[in-house]
A protein has these predicted regions:
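Acidic-basic catalytic patches of nuclease active cores, encompassing PD-(D/E)XK
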Residues: 1-27
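Hydrophobic "anchor" residues on beta-strands that sit immediately upstream
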Residues: 23, 47-49, 89
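Active-site metal-binding core of divalent-cation-utilizing nuclease and nuclease-like domains
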Residues: 23-44
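Conserved protein kinase catalytic core
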Residues: 32, 57, 99
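Conserved catalytic cores of phosphodiester-cleaving nucleases, focusing on short active-site segments
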Residues: 37-58, 73
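Mg2+/Mn2+-dependent nuclease catalytic core
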Residues: 55-77
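A short, N-terminal amphipathic alpha-helix
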Residues: 75-85
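Domain-level recognition of nuclease-like catalytic cores that cleave nucleotide substrates
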Residues: 83-110
């Protein structure tokens, strides 16, 4: 996904989360060489580490969420929690953005 397209998708995802009463804690958190977390949000004392994927259709976007990418996200989440000295409930979510809709997949690592 191009950076411009990615930024647009992330803005839509943030707006979507705010509409669901999430508090946006941080966006584009860079965890050194581990990777990046697109959106860190919080709701009901649970931190949500969100990966935003954008494509013309759902299937293409979801297929871009690979095991390797999930592994990097998990490492980035661990780094974030250690850096911020947080011991909190959390989950890793995916937000799939396409032209027509937004799909919110909570706790994708189960």
């Amino acid at each position: 996904m191009s950076r411009e397209k990615g930024n647009f998708a992330e803005k839509r995802a943030i707006s979507f989360l705010k509409d669901l009463n999430f508090e946006i804690i941080e966006k584009n958190f860079y965890a050194k060489k581990l990777g990046e977390i697109d959106i860190i949000a919080k709701k009901n004392d649970t931190y949500h580490f969100c990966e935003v994927k954008s494509a013309p259709d759902y299937e293409t976007a979801i297929n871009n969420l690979t095991a390797s990418k999930l592994s990097k996200i998990k490492s980035s989440v661990d780094y974030y929690l250690q850096t911020k000295k947080l011991d909190v409930a959390f989950c890793i979510d995916a937000i799939i953005v396409n032209d027509e809709e937004i799909n919110f997949l909570e706790n994708i690592t189960l």
